[in-house]
UniProtKB/Swiss-Prot annotation:
This is Calcium-transporting ATPase. It catalyses: Ca(2+)(in) + ATP + H2O = Ca(2+)(out) + ADP + phosphate + H(+). It comes from Plasmodium falciparum (isolate K1 / Thailand). It is found in: Membrane. One of its GO terms (cellular component) is membrane. SUPFAM superfamilies: Calcium ATPase, transduction domain A (SSF81653), Calcium ATPase, transmembrane domain M (SSF81665), HAD-like (SSF56784), Metal cation-transporting ATPase, ATP-binding domain N (SSF81660). Residues 82-92, 292-300, 995-1000, 1068-1118, 1173-1185 are extracellular. Residues 1-63, 113-270, 322-974, 1022-1042, 1141-1151, 1207-1228 are cytoplasmic.
Length: 1228
């Protein structure tokens, strides 16, 4: 049973029905439904059990640093309660534990809120499932909730329906059945489905090859069929994806930053424990001092000192500062179209070593585009035109001057000119020295790019003769200089002389009539002619986009002279002799016959506008075929406009279903109308019959009546079939016989397109008589489609996004490998990969070499299923040692496995995708990146980052920002650690000397959370280094602080401790008695615990001293403590300035390079002043106001930290240069 269901595609339908015990004519019986429900369950996706709010809260405290702080707060609270026997307790005595607990509660609240809003991917998956299904039960068709669909149910599906479960096709009632399953498989085009069984050799094939299986949640775009359900719920392919997402949720998903912070917490806890125990043991001899009253209280007192030491050592503000820094980074990334859903992912981007990118919709536009076409412009010569791009403008040039790329970048013709010695230029989209005014990456590839851009702008300002084509400046030949930085505009006279531009001709009339009218797709525009809706098969839509975007409108039809033998049975097509009166007529956008300006279209401008429009790509591509029972049935009433019929038939279907790149938008598109350009072509004729596509003919034809009442047959289809049926061909002068030589020339052109992974189509037409309409069976259609006139052919592909090639080159410069993982076929994947620099132009062609990977293999293309069959060791070897890889025909499980192996190898993996099939891999990767416009909700919710512009280039900007954030994070962590080392050193020295503690725990909390917090946050605004994207990515296990850096900050921290203790001691021993306090000697200060045994010890009563003179060492020390705290704060401000750079002096990088830091240091000092001079605050923090002389002393003790750090930087920088010099010598 399991075997039959698993491999239902290799069994006859009758065998499948027999195993499922169901009759295809009656369906399941109602009495057996309960048994099937018990056996197979309901047709719904499981949802992972959600954590309770209590579990979420507990998870926020499952952190070592947090646990240490909780323990410190608890002990502090207990010790404060124990002090009740000695003194009156006030609320301010509990300030330390209260502040710690409050901070932890706030952090937990933020964490719970983020987690509650993050996990929605499973709910999004459930929303993909259709809610209703048409099912046959007890011989009757009925509509039921798809939840109650069971294995063995017979279902009916037609255009616009979503498949409610995995099903085996029983019978197709239309001539063809096409399914849009790109959201599941990643294929860029809709897929033909058949009912016939497949060979046994396909038992373990990938899901893309299962041509007789319909998968749950995929959409029917053409045809009608019945099928039997073979899998429901979690057993379906989309159920497997859900299971993978659940598994990914349960995996350890700690980011590198979280791992580092946890490791830091472990190391810190060990250090704190050692220091606390050491301090406690050092003071063991003082436990019985009279001041404590008893040994127990002495023990508790020094235990409290140890707790204070722990508070000083823990950077309480670190979590808040890290969160703030990441949040600020996300704001900057939003401006660059990267929306961050999980804060920690920002830092992880900085250490990305491998980007695994989906192809369709990520690296490419996810819009099939016509990139090359050919016509017989001359009598015996086939002319091919190829798409070229400059900036936002597209052109078609004669391809005899171009290379055989998918579509010609600028290298194709500029390098051609350069090779001929006519011009020195280099303006390819992916070549060194290239320059483009809008190019975001030119700074990385040319040191003179900024100067060149300025020169270009100046040239533009001085020239008012730019052509409509977007040319920037016409540069005469005599102005050319012999250097690689010469800028050549496309409007240059040199180009006009060298390149033949395509210009629409009236002789191409029938070619475009065939493109538009032999086509069941449609596009709808708003009032500005911007596409807002499109319906139909992606291939047919590419033909309409070609006509619409280049605004090709009907003008004349030519009186072509036909061969005599052809004229015997037909009447020549007559010219309408009418010029187009449309306000968007041909002369507005294209040149006349005397003007050789090239056709232009700002396709990308439309793309930009589509982001703001309600852009829904509905897949009711062939809605007009719904319900057709036979080939050639009258599609529309004779004499009725094709456009009106098409629009009215689609009226109640436009919201039926959508493709995987549907963009949910609430904008109202009720004013959208069919494209004026497309309508103008369809209004040229009235459609009589459609002869639908069949696998045997591989053709589709349409019979129309033009305005002259002539009956014309237009055909499109597979080039080999069209060419075989053609007897003539159309030129600009006449109609000529098509001989074998010309047929071979056409075949060669088509084969060249195929080598470039283009999907090819050819077009033909012929004149019919009224008797030809009396057709009754399929054989009549074969006869009708003979003796055709060849019009031309074209190639389409989903082209790469603008600048994606440069973005990938920049990744390579930054030491990041880019892998393509796609569900598409190997030829298309390889062609795109070469175009965008994932593969080199001349590599990866030999498929046999690709699959026999050895140690020397550097470039590889792999089929997903074959890669899965490799041993784990071989998979690791390939992924570790191969710099460029393309994976094709991959399934969701393959993508997840690739990501898992890469992570096991220690790589930091970023995964991009837009479809449902990408969700498991997005979840598993260190960074999941989804497309925001065309991405499914499933992909978005499974991701960490969403790209608002669907552009791979944005990923590079995000990585740059991630690296900058990490560098800044290192700066403020170093700053905070050195500060905490200073505090620890202060307490340790105090305990070692046996003097009163100079800093109270609440003062340390103030410094750690507030005073240090502002400068630390401001360090997150440090601008990026100029070479941040020219460095290799760091390893995710690299420590934030290495041994040398720690030694460096121990030196600084030791000075901080010495300075804070020294000014404290200075006040007792040497400070002028401006406040009337009594100077004492060092012995008295270091043995203050024995004060009660000194019979004649007398001091002046200052501040809040009691009658007990020994209180001089507790309440009387408030001024000394204030001086100590002020020195600590000012040193920290100087230390923040030192943290601007790890190696560069303040003379090289002045503080005003980061004005946020300057303002933050001033703000921190103002806050410190507030607690000194506002009495209520001064009482809480145990401080008093300082005089001008006091501040002078504070400055004298603080400023040397600048000098000390400058000395350390000098030696550290010199050592760094020596290391670099040594490495260079070794490399040389």
């Amino acid at each position: 049973m399991e075997e039959v269901i698993k491999n239902a595609h290799t069994y006859d339908v009758e065998d499948v029905l027999k195993f499922l015990d169901v009759n295809k004519d009656n369906g399941l019986k109602n009495e057996e439904l309960d048994d099937r429900r018990l056996k197979y369950g309901l047709n719904e996706l499981e949802v992972e059990k959600k954590k309770s709010i209590f579990e979420l809260i507990l998870n926020q405290f499952d952190d070592l640093l947090v646990k240490i702080l909780l323990l410190a707060a608890f002990i502090s609270f207990v010790l404060t309660l124990l002090d009740m026997k000695h003194k009156k307790i006030e609320i301010c005595d509990f300030i330390e534990p209260l502040v710690i607990v409050l901070i932890l509660i706030l952090n937990a609240a933020v964490g719970v809120w983020q987690e509650c809003n993050a996990e929605k991917s499973l709910e999004a998956l459930k929303e993909l499932q259709p809610t209703k299904a048409k099912v046959l039960r007890d011989g009757k068709w009925e509509i039921i909730d798809s939840k109650y669909l069971y294995v063995g149910d017979i279902i009916e599906l037609s255009v616009g329906n979503k498949t409610p479960a995995d099903a085996r096709i029983i019978k197709i009632y239309s001539t063809s059945l096409k399914v849009e399953q790109s959201m599941l498989t990643g294929e860029s085009c809709s897929v033909d489905k058949y009912a016939e069984k497949m060979e046994d050799s396909y038992k373990n094939c990938e899901i893309q090859l299962k041509k007789n299986i319909l998968f749950s949640s995929t959409a029917i775009v053409c045809g009608r069929c019945i099928a039997v359900v073979i899998n429901i719920g979690m057993k379906t392919e989309i159920g497997h994806i859900q299971h993978a997402v659940i598994e990914s949720n349960s995996e350890d998903t700690q980011t590198p930053l979280q791992i580092k912070i946890d490791l830091f917490g472990q190391q810190l806890s060990k250090i704190i424990f050692v220091i606390c125990v050491t301090v406690w043991i050092i003071n063991f001899k003082h436990f019985s001092d009279p001041i404590h009253g008893s040994f127990l209280y002495g023990c508790l007192y020094y235990f409290k000192i140890s707790v204070a030491l722990a508070v000083a050592a823990i950077p309480e503000g670190l979590p808040a500062v890290i969160t703030t820094c990441l949040a600020l980074g996300t704001r900057r990334m939003v401006k660059k179209n990267a929306i961050v859903r999980k804060l920690q992912s920002v830092e992880t981007l900085g250490c990305t070593t491998v980007i695994c990118s989906d192809k369709t919709g990520t690296l490419t536009t996810n819009q099939m585009t016509t990139t090359v076409f050919h016509l017989f412009r001359e009598s015996d010569s086939l002319t091919e035109y190829q798409l070229c791009q400059k900036g936002d403008t597209y052109y078609f040039y004669e391809s005899s001057n171009l290379t055989n790329d998918i579509y010609a970048g600028e290298s194709s013709f500029f390098n051609k000119l350069k090779d001929e010695g006519n011009v020195e230029a280099l303006t390819d989209d992916g070549e060194e020295g290239s320059i483009d005014e809008a190019d975001p990456y030119s700074d990385y590839f040319s040191s003179d790019s900024k100067k060149m851009k300025n020169d270009l702008n100046n040239n533009n300002n001085n020239n008012n003769n730019s052509s409509r084509s977007g040319a920037k400046r016409n540069i005469p030949l005599k102005e050319m200089k012999s250097n690689e930085n010469t800028i050549i505009s496309r409007g240059s006279k040199i180009l006009e002389d060298k390149i033949n531009k395509y210009c629409y001709s009236e002789y191409d009339y029938n070619f475009y009539m065939c493109l538009v009218n032999c086509n069941e797709a449609n596009i709808f525009c708003n009032d500005n002619s911007q596409i807002v809706k499109k319906f139909g098969d992606s291939t047919e839509l590419a033909l309409l986009h070609f006509v619409h975007n280049f605004d090709i409108l009907p003008t004349f039809s030519k009186n072509n002279k036909m061969p005599a033998e052809y004229e015997k049975n037909t009447t020549p097509v007559q010219s309408s002799n009418k010029k187009d009166k449309s306000p968007r007529g041909i002369n507005k956008f294209f040149s006349s016959k005397n003007d050789n300006s090239h056709i232009t279209s700002t396709l990308n401008e439309n793309d930009k506008n589509l982001k703001n429009a309600n852009h829904s790509n509905y897949t009711t591509a062939q809605a007009t075929t719904n319900g057709y029972e036979a080939i050639g049935e009258n599609t529309f009433e004779h004499g009725t406009s094709f456009e009106n019929c098409f629009h009215s038939k689609l009226g109640n279907k436009i919201n039926t279903t959508s493709t995987h790149n549907n963009n949910n938008n609430n904008n109202n598109n009720s004013n959208s109308v069919p494209s004026e350009c497309i309508s103008s072509w369809r209004n040229e004729c009235k459609q009589i019959k459609i002869i639908e596509f069949t696998r045997e003919r591989k053709l589709m034809s349409v019979i129309v009546e033009n305005k002259k009442k002539e009956i014309i047959l237009y055909c499109k289809g597979a080039p080999e079939n069209i060419i075989k049926n053609c007897k003539y061909y159309l030129t600009k002068n006449d109609i000529r016989p098509l001989n074998e030589t010309l047929k071979n020339e056409i075949h060669n052109k088509i084969q060249n397109m195929g080598k470039r992974a283009l999907r090819t189509l050819s077009f033909a037409y012929k004149k019919l008589s009224s008797k030809d309409l009396n057709i009754k069976n399929t054989d009549d259609y074969y006869k009708l489609e003979q003796d055709l006139i060849y019009l031309g052919g074209l190639g389409i592909i989903d082209p790469p996004r603008k600048y994606v090639g440069r973005a990938i080159r920049l990744c390579h410069m930054a030491g990041i490998r880019v892998f393509m993982i796609t569900g598409d076929n190997i030829n298309t994947a390889r062609a795109i990969a070469k175009e965008i620099n994932i593969l080199n132009k001349n590599e990866g062609d030999d498929e046999k070499d690709n699959y026999t990977n050895n140690k020397n293999t550097q470039i590889c293309c792999y089929n997903g299923r074959e890669f899965e069959d490799f041993s784990l060791e071989k998979q690791k070897h390939i992924l570790k040692n191969t710099p460029r890889i393309v994976f094709c025909r991959t399934e969701p499980k393959h993508k997840k496995q690739i990501v898992k192996v890469l992570k096991d190898l220690g790589e930091t993996v970023a995964m991009t995708g837009d479809g449902v099939n990408d969700a498991p891999a997005l979840k598993s990767a260190d960074i999941g990146i989804a497309m925001g416009i065309n991405g499914t909700e499933v992909a978005k919710e499974a991701s960490d980052i969403v790209l608002a512009d669907d552009n791979f280039n944005t990923i590079v900007e995000a990585i740059k920002e991630g690296r900058c954030i990490y560098n800044n994070m290192k700066a403020f962590i170093r700053y905070l650690i050195s500060s905490n080392i200073g505090e620890v050193a202060s307490i340790f020295i105090t305990a070692l000397l046996g003097i009163p503690d100079s800093l109270a725990p609440v003062q340390l909390l103030w410094v750690n959370l507030v005073t240090d917090g502002l400068p630390a946050t401001a360090l997150g605004f440090n601008p990026p280094e100029h070479d941040v994207m020219k460095c290799k990515p760091r390893h995710k296990n690299d420590n934030l602080i290495n041994g040398l850096t720690l030694l460096r900050y121990i030196i600084i921290g030791t000075y901080v401790g010495i300075a804070t203790v020294s000014i404290f001691v200075y006040w007792f021993l040497f400070y002028p008695d401006s406040d009337m306090h009594t100077l004492i000697n060092f012995y008295q200060l270091s043995h203050y615990n024995q004060c009660k045994a000194w019979n004649n010890f007398r001091v002046n009563k200052v501040y809040d001293m009691s009658e007990d003179h020994c209180s001089y060492f507790s309440a009387g020390k408030i001024k000394a403590s204030t001086l100590s705290l002020s020195v600590l704060v000012l040193i920290e401000m100087f230390n923040a300035l030192n943290a601007l750079s790890e190696y560069n002096s303040l003379f090289e990088i002045p503080p005003w390079r980061n004005m946020y830091l300057v303002l933050a240091t001033i703000g921190s000092l103002l806050l410190h002043v507030l607690i000194l001079y506002i009495p209520p605050l001064a009482r809480i923090f145990g401080v008093v106001p300082l005089s001008a002389y006091d501040w002078f002393l504070v400055f004298l003790w603080s400023f040397p930290v600048i000098i000390l750090d400058e000395i350390i930087k000098f030696y550290a920088k010199r050592k760094l240069k020596e290391e670099q010099r040594t490495k260079k010598i070794k490399i040389d």
